């Protein structure tokens, strides 16, 4: 893939450091590739997506290879999460998605790497290593820019 000048997308959650949770739609791996391939990553959200602690409200999507789903889920439970298989759904890459509920993410950068080191994980929906460069947030009365 060639370098992109910019990449514009939404997020399921964001914090003041412009770290994100994405992947509710199941395209997290391709979205992360696009974010890494862009000079500027612009995220457009509404105010309901803001949180002080990622993962508190929205589940973290993790793309897994089918044969590893149970093993990955056991590891995620050891880490304190409640993994739930997204039944009847496949990612854009034909893999399965496990959504991890009740999984507050205190240090997103570290957890992103830790989850990706579990054998069978393709990618997870934490965008902390490649976080947004700009967040455009719409409220009922205004548009705020976090850059």
Residue spans for each PLM region:
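Conserved phosphate- and dinucleotide-binding cores of soluble alpha/beta proteins
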Residues: 2-147
